[in-house]
C-alpha cells in the first residue's frame, strides 16, 4: 500500500506589504497599501496590510477609493526587486526540507514532504518549523495548509490567516471543506461560481455531492475536474524545484511570468508580452537559432490556462516579430472572462541561424539583418551595464509590470491542470 502523501501549501501573508514592513519597521502595525505609483490617483492597490484590510481596503481597489475607506492609509510604491529577493529567501528555506518545491508566483509554493517525515517529523511539525523560520529569519509571516494533495493544501492555507497552520486530513476533511463557498476551490473563478450559483451549488459540499455527469454536461471538462477536487481527488505531483532536462537538445526557448498584479487591459498584456519576447529573442541569438513559430500561454485569475501557436512566414530572432505574433494570438483567443495572472511566450520550431532563409518579395533581407544587428548591440549594452540600461518607451508607462528581467530571472512557472480555451 502506497504511503499517503504529505503536501504543504505555503502562502506569504500580504506579501508585498509584509516585505515593505520588514524593510521599514516604522510601518509595522500601520494601514499601508502597496501600489504601482502613489502619485497617480488612478492607480490601484496591489496589496494592503491587515490594518488597512480591516478598514475595507482591498486588492485592485483604486487609490482614491482606498483613501475613502481609510483616511490614514499610507501608500507605498512597489519595489519588485525587494519582493523577488524575499521570494528567493523563502524558497531557500523550503529547500532545507524537500527538493520538491513548486513555486506559484512570488508568494506561494507547494512542497511535497512525504519523504521528509523520517528526518523532520509530521507534516504539521514541518509546517510549524517553516513558519517559525520564515518569521525569525525574514520578519514576515505565512499561512500553511497541510493535506494529502495540492488542492486541499491550498484550501488549508486560505482557511486561516494570518500566521496560521491548518491540517486537512481524512477525518476532518468534510467538516472543514464542505461548508466552504464553492468559489474557494481551485479553478472556480467568478464566471464558474456564477454558473454554479445558478444550479443552486453554493458550497464545496454541494459540488461534491452533485452528479459528475451533470457537471460535465453544464461546465465541460472543468466540471468533472471540480467534482474530483471537491471530493478530495487530486493526484497532481509537486514538481522538483528548477527541474531541467539535462543535455537534451533545445527544441524551444521560452519564458513565462506570474505578474505582480492582475493584467486588466490590452496595454498591460502588450507590456508583459514584449518584455518576455525580448528575453526569448536574446536567448535565440545566444544559442544561434531562429524560430519558425511562436506559442503564447495564458493563465487567468481562476488559474485556468491554455496555449496557442502560430506559424511565421519567415524564421526570426527579432523581439518585435515574436511579440507581435504572441499578441495577435492573445487578441484572437482571449475574451476577458477573468483578469490575466500569468503569460508565457515561447519560440518553437527552431532552426540554426546558419540555415539560409527564403526571402519573400515583401520581406527585406537587408532590413532583417539591420534589425538583428541592432538588437544584438542592445544585448551587448545590457550585458555590460545591466538589463535596465536600455528599455522601450512603453515600459515607462507601468514601472511595476516592466520591473522584470525575464532573461536573467528565467522563471518558468507551472502550467495549470487544464488545457483548453477560455
List the model feature ranges, each with a label:
Residues 1-228, 238, 282, 365-422:
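Gly/Gly-Pro- and Ser/Thr-rich, intrinsically disordered tail segments characteristic of DNA damage-repair
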Residues 104-108, 147-150, 289-293, 338-342:
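Short Gly/Ser/Thr- and Asp/Glu-enriched loop/turn motifs at secondary-structure junctions
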Residues 15, 38-41, 301-305, 350-354:
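Short, charged/polar surface micro-motifs in flexible loops or helix N-caps
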Residues 28-30, 71, 140, 290-294, ...:
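A generic structural signal for short beta-strands and their flanking turns/coil linkers
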Residues 9, 192-340:
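DNA-contacting surface of Y-family translesion DNA polymerases
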Residues 109-115, 307-310, 352, 357-363:
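Short, hydrophobic beta-strand segments
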Residues 321, 327-384:
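C-terminal hydrophobic structural anchor segments
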